[in-house]
Design a protein with these regions (language model features):
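GNAT-family acyltransferases
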Residues: 1-103, 116, 120, 161-176, ...
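Hydrophobic residues within well-ordered alpha-helices
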Residues: 140-141
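Conserved GNAT acetyl-CoA-binding A-motif
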Residues: 119-129
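Conserved beta-strand-loop-alpha-helix junction that forms the acyl-donor binding cleft
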Residues: 128-137
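Flexible ATP-lid and adjacent glycine-rich G1/G2 motifs of the Bergerat
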Residues: 113
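Glycine-rich acyl-CoA binding loop
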Residues: 106
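Conserved catalytic-core motifs of GNAT/GCN5-like acyltransferases
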Residues: 147-161
């Protein structure tokens, strides 16, 4: 599965193809692992093993995020909890390196995954969940058009700590409007000569409601 956009390509995560680039992107940034199930990778070999585990994971599809500007992997994301019988899939285990955070490529990557889930795989419900204390992830979900559904208290134990999970969703009946907002935001005319957005994604979505 390869998803291509104007500013980014998502391709199957591969230890052979992506370890070196991802190590350069995340090395020394242990804070990136705070909210993930994985512990920080202290060496490139540790990162390779982590990626190999993700390649072999059952019930999940991990994709490397490769910005067109550099051609080098700068993060990953996955489809999880895929339940075709119920039409439900989750996007999760998202790792954005500092170079990928707050970029057009990062937003387009999330758009491409949502579009593939709804338009090509035919899912009815697209989920996002995170540690309830992870405020940046909660803000990101809302910016991307997910609806907050509530808190699952004492939902998991992660790294020895109890976790409450915040749940968000997007439905197929909502996707057409979300898609229009994404595509309007991604238009080259929405960015100035230095790549700064003229209108935010939330502004565009609100104007279309």
């Amino acid at each position: 599965m390869t998803l291509r956009g104007r500013t980014v390509t998502l391709e199957p995560l591969s230890a052979e193809s992506h370890t070196a680039d991802l190590w350069k992107a995340v090395r020394g940034h242990d804070e990136l692992w705070t909210w993930l199930f994985d512990s920080p990778c202290g060496t490139e070999a540790d990162l390779r093993r982590t990626i190999e585990e993700k390649q072999a994971a059952r019930g999940a599809v991990f994709l490397a995020i490769v910005p067109a500007e550099t051609g080098r992997a700068a993060g990953w994301a996955s489809y999880m909890r895929m339940e075709p019988a119920h039409g439900v899939v989750e996007v999760g285990s998202i790792l954005f390196s500092p170079s990928l955070q707050r970029t057009t490529a990062a937003t387009e990557a999330m758009y491409l995954m949502a579009s593939h889930a709804f338009d090509h795989l035919g899912y009815r419900r697209y989920e996002w969940k995170c540690n309830a204390q992870n405020l940046p992830s909660r803000r990101a979900a809302e910016r991307l058009g997910f609806t907050f559904e509530g808190i699952f208290r004492q939902h998991m134990v992660i790294k020895g700590k109890s976790r409450d999970s915040a749940w968000f969703s997007m439905l197929d009946s909502e996707w057409a409007a979300r898609k229009r907002a994404f595509e309007a935001w991604l238009e080259p005319t929405n960015f100035d000569g230095e790549g700064r957005q003229r209108q935010g994604l939330g502004q565009i979505a609100a104007a279309q409601d």
